[in-house]
Amino acid sequence: MNTKQIKRNAILGILFFLPVTFLLFLYPAKHNYNTLDVLTNGVLDLNGFSSDADAPILLEDHLTVLGFFGMHPIGKHTTASNLKELVYDKFKGFKKFQIVIVLPEGTEEEARTLKAELMKYEELKFWHFVYGSPNSIKAIHQSLNVPDALDANLATDHVYIIDNELSLRGRLDDRTDNELASKKPVYQKASYDAIKVADLKNKMSEDVRVLFTEYRQKRKGNFDSTSRRANDLKGTDE
């Protein structure tokens, strides 16, 4: 066998075994991935809220990015644009995905103006504005049980991930590698600041992807949750 044949066979062997080795490396991760933590159960649904959609807009049975734009939604143009470009455009093709923005009754015209600006290049089929009373909006936000609050206009730049069982998802431990190495105190990530591009691009997009992976594994019957729940941390020194 000449040198050229030896080289050729070696290259073919590498091309054959490299993908197989890569798949074998990934196989354990497929079945032992970390799921997105449940932070709050029993988030209130949107019963009684109105919208421009033909059917009622609800959180249950959907993966929802939930936001509160308050009495002046047009003033949240930057927040909305970031959400559209960094989250909506990435996940709009996934089954049951939606972005829902909660607004006070009486803001319908301003909301339509904002949506028209976002719809310059495409229809936002999975983006919904819903309208309710101030008390109903406060009740929805309070049910999230998060540290950040709505302002006097019932608005916040923070957005939230709600799963199909009406649970708030996020991270029980959002420490960086350096913070872990330094043994900094544990802190959660219950919301994502839509003004900060990095927060949406690097954290929220990743967390939504992880949740869709969880749903896919459940459908295939391969789901084995290794995530920690909020109750698991009670009574620990972590």
Task: Give the location of each predicted region.
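Thiol-based oxidoreductase modules, predominantly thioredoxin-like and allied folds used
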Residues: 95-109, 125-135
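Short, internal strand/loop/helix patches
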Residues: 115-158
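Thiol-/selenol-based redox modules, centered on thioredoxin-like
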Residues: 156-157, 161-238
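Short active-site neighborhood of thiol/selenol oxidoreductases, capturing the structured segment around
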Residues: 56-83
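Conserved helix-turn-beta segment immediately C-terminal to the redox Cys motif
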Residues: 79-101
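Short acidic, S/G/P-rich loop/turn micro-motifs used as interaction or catalytic elements
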Residues: 71-76, 105-109, 176
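Structural beta-sheet core signal
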Residues: 67, 99-101, 161
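N-terminal targeting signals for export/organelle localization
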Residues: 1-50
